[in-house]
From Swiss-Prot:
Protein name according to UniProt: Carboxypeptidase E
Note on how the cofactor is bound: Binds 1 zinc ion per subunit.
BP terms from Gene Ontology: cardiac left ventricle morphogenesis; cellular response to dexamethasone stimulus; cellular response to hydrogen peroxide; cellular response to staurosporine; enkephalin processing; insulin processing; insulin secretion involved in cellular response to glucose stimulus; negative regulation of branching morphogenesis of a nerve
Topology class, membrane: Peripheral membrane protein
Highest rank taxon of the organism: Eukaryota
A Pfam family per the record: Peptidase_M14
Locations listed in the record: Cytoplasmic vesicle, Secretory vesicle; Cytoplasmic vesicle, Secretory vesicle membrane; Secreted
Glycan attachment points: 139, 390
Misc. comment: An autoantigen recognized by serum of pretype I diabetes.
Keywords: Carboxypeptidase, Cleavage on pair of basic residues, Cytoplasmic vesicle, Glycoprotein, Hydrolase, Membrane, Metal-binding, Metalloprotease, Protease, Secreted, Signal, Zinc, Zymogen
Organism taxonomic ancestry: Eukaryota, Metazoa, Chordata, Craniata, Vertebrata
Required cofactor names: Zn(2+)
Chain ranges of the Peptidase M14 domain: 52-372
Sequence similarity: Belongs to the peptidase M14 family.
Length: 476
């Protein structure tokens, strides 16, 4: 009885804290809608999903609503603040929220990087509510995902830009108003241009991954980086993300690396070493969206060049070159593979169309999330069973390595096939293993590395044994 009372009190306290947080947010937010507007929105909900645009206070309210409904599998946190002080909110869904469980991969969705591209923002709010609802209903797919994956959802990377775009009168919004952050910075051109570094390294030799290793301080000191950009860079570097998607608007296509062309031309297919798996990941999204994958779909605009589009996917450089983009930054600075998904021809479509966008994208969002459980996964440990962090996992024939996380766990996304994987770490002898990879689930391959000191001791013992044997044989 006391335990039940304690749980009720805890829930009540949580609700009061959340309510106070929301009231404070609305009091300080000049664009907050009136109470009557909020009541109207609640009347238009289905399964807790309000198919309407959420201004900043309403976004917070929607995330808190999910958290209060599914406290056991969710938490809300912030990675930083926008230039105007709005929080960059994330809702996490996991069977152990707030904790990296060894062997469990980390996934992220990011929306609304361009503030006037609003569909992704709303879809991610809807997705959080949907995952909560379906988990409580016992949906096997969703339950398995939440029990085996740590899912991070950031509905808006550019809340300042969204507020500017949403403040325009009428349904027809300007194509560019609110695209940039409050400083006028295009966030998807604001990341360190690691493509240029890796293109030089391809020719002259050099690292093929983690090109910002140990350079967090330099990022903080770079005055050209927006606060939103810096916050996401730290997020990417601090959590061992495996897979990600960045949701945009203005077209209908799933875009994969590289985004920036090698030659500097405007259009050129720019494959990365993991071109095969990236093509497969992009198709995993587009193929479940009936509009995006329709081969007879006309271009969004009369003069659009969609010649690079195949099955609703495109290589970024083949479409148009983007220097300083977040997608390639993920791939070249961390273990995270990210694609960019363009969700709608209109950037800020009428509110009444949001439900149809959800219906078109719901299965794609879930199917793409499931792709994190492909390829190879495992642990790198020493002979005593201690985890080895930052061990390098190399795949023969693919010039892009990944590294193990702090618990020695690693994940390597791959298409089906036969591979040779090598695990190595400073001070240890490398080990190579052969592995046959199916489509899914991921194959478990663990590595136990012997240190050089252990090998020397072993060789010394072998030499002593040999000397003893020779002494006995020759009667020394």
């Amino acid at each position: 009885m006391a335990g039940r009372g304690g749980r009720v009190l805890l829930a009540l306290c949580a609700a009061l804290v959340a309510g106070g947080w929301l009231l404070a947010a609305e009091a300080q937010e000049p664009g907050a809608p009136a109470a009557g507007m909020r009541r109207r929105r609640r009347l238009q909900q289905e399964d807790g999903i309000s198919f309407e645009y959420h201004r900043y206070p309403e976004l917070r309210e929607a995330l808190v609503s999910v958290w209060l409904q599914c406290t056991a599998i969710s938490r809300i946190y912030t990675v930083g603040r926008s230039f105007e002080g709005r929080e960059l909110l994330v809702i996490e869904l996991s069977d152990n929220p707030g904790v990296h469980e060894p062997g469990e991969p980390e996934f992220k969705y990011i929306g609304n990087m361009h503030g006037n591209e609003a569909v992704g923002r709303e879809l991610l709010i809807f997705l959080a509510q949907y995952l909560c609802n379906e988990y409580q209903r016992g949906n096997e797919t969703i339950v398995n995902l939440i029990h085996s994956t740590r899912i991070h959802i950031m509905p808006s990377l550019n809340p300042d830009g969204f507020e500017k775009a949403a403040s325009q009168p009428g349904e027809l919004k300007d194509w560019f108003v609110g695209r940039s952050n409050a400083q006028g910075i295009d966030l998807n051109r604001n990341f360190p241009d690691l493509d240029r570094i890796v293109y030089v390294n391809e020719k002259e030799g050099g690292p093929n991954n983690h090109l910002l290793k140990n350079l967090k301080k330099i990022v903080d000191q770079n005055s050209k980086l927006a606060p939103e950009t810096k916050a996401v860079i730290h997020w990417i570097m601090d959590i061992p993300f495996v897979l990600s998607a960045n949701l945009h608007g203005g077209d209908l296509v799933a875009n994969y690396p590289y985004d920036e062309t090698r030659s500097g031309t405007a259009h050129e297919y720019s494959s990365c070493p993991d071109d095969a798996i990236f093509q497969s990941l992009a198709r995993a999204y587009s193929s479940f969206n009936p509009v995006m994958s329709d081969p007879n779909r006309p271009p969004c605009r009369k003069n659009d060049d969609d010649s690079s589009f195949v099955d609703g996917t495109t290589n970024g450089g083949a479409w148009y070159s983007v220097p300083g983009g977040m997608q390639d930054f993920n791939y070249l600075s961390s273990n995270c593979f990210e694609i960019t998904v363009e969700l709608s021809c209109e950037k800020f479509p009428p509110e009444e169309t949001l439900k149809s966008y959800w219906e078109d994208n719901k299965n794609s969002l879930i199917n793409y999330l499931e792709q994190i459980h492909r390829g190879v996964k495992g642990f790198v440990r020493d002979l005593q069973g201690n985890p080895i962090a930052n061990a390098t996992i190399s795949v023969d024939g693919i010039d892009h390595d990944v590294t193990s996380a702090k618990d020695g766990d690693y994940w390597r996304l791959l298409v089906p096939g036969n591979y040779k994987l090598t695990a190595s770490a400073p001070g240890y002898l490398a080990i190579t293993k052969k592995v046959a990879v199916p489509f899914s689930p991921a194959v478990g391959v663990d590595f136990e590395l012997e240190s050089f000191s252990e090998r020397k001791e072993e060789e010394k013992e072998e030499l002593m044994e040999w000397w003893k044997m020779m002494s006995e044989t020759l009667n020394f």
